[in-house]
Amino acid sequence: MTSIAKSIVLLASLATFAYSLYVVGSLMMFLSTPRSISKAHTWIFNLLDNKSRLQTAYGPVVFDTLYLIGFIFQHSFLKSAVVKKLLAKLGLSGAERTIYSLTSSLCLHYLIVNWLPAQSIVLWQIDVEQSAPLWWTFVITHGICWVVIFGGSLVMDLPELLGVKQAYYDLKAYGPPISYKSGELRNLYAHVRHPSFVGLSVILFATNVMSVDRLVMALLLTTYMYLAWSTDQKDVAYQKIQLQRKKLELKAK
C-alpha cells in the first residue's frame, strides 16, 4: 500500500478502536444491568403445564440463536488462514486486525440492538432491587469481572488487540507488532486472544433473571470460548514464570 493508503488505514483503525470501546460499553450495560422481574413467567420445570409459554419463546430463541451463530461464525471465519491470505494478496495485512475488530464490533452491536428477550420462561429470578445486599453483591461481582477483563486487555496490549498498532507499524514500515514479542508469548496469543474466560463466564451466568434467551447465550458463548481458547501446558508454564517474575519485582521494590 502507498503511504496515503496506510494513513487512511491508520485513521480507520483509530475510528474502529473508539467504536469498539463504545460497543463494549453497550455490552457491559446489556449483560450487567440487573433485569426487572416479570410476573408473567413459567418456571422452566413447569413447561408441560403451560405449553403456551414455550410457544411464545420459540421466535425470540430462534432469532437470538441465529444472532449468536452469526457472531461466532464471523469471529472464527475472519481468523482463518483463507481470509489472512486473501488480505495479504490485496496488500491489506496491516489492516487485518482492524477489519477483524470492526466486523466483530458490528456483529456484536447488531446482536445487542436486536436481541429479543424471552422472559416467559425462566430458570431462576431474584429481585435484587428489593435487597441492598443482593444488589451490591450483583454489582460488585460483575464489576470485578469487568475490571479483570479490561485489565487483561491492557496487559495483552489493547491497541494491538484492536488493530491500531498493526496499522501504525505498517505505516512506519516496521515488522508486525507480534514479531517483537517472545516465542512463548506468541504461542499464548495464538491460543487465546481475549482475557478471562472465567470472568466472561461469570458475567454470562451470574444474572438475577436467567431467562431462556440468556441461558442460550451463556451456553453458546461459554462453549465457543472453551473450544476456541486452546491453551496448552507450555502456555500455563509461561504464565506461571511471568507471575513469579512479577512477584520478585514487587518484592524488590
UniProtKB/Swiss-Prot annotation:
TM helices/strands, residue ranges: 3-30, 57-78, 97-113, 133-161, 189-207, 214-231
Topological domain spans for side Perinuclear space: 31-56, 114-132, 208-213
Topological region Nuclear: 1-2, 79-96, 162-188, 232-253
A GO CC annotation given for this chain: nuclear inner membrane
Main location: nucleus
Record localization: Nucleus inner membrane
Keywords: Membrane, Nucleus, Transmembrane, Transmembrane helix
Name of the protein in its database record: Nurim homolog
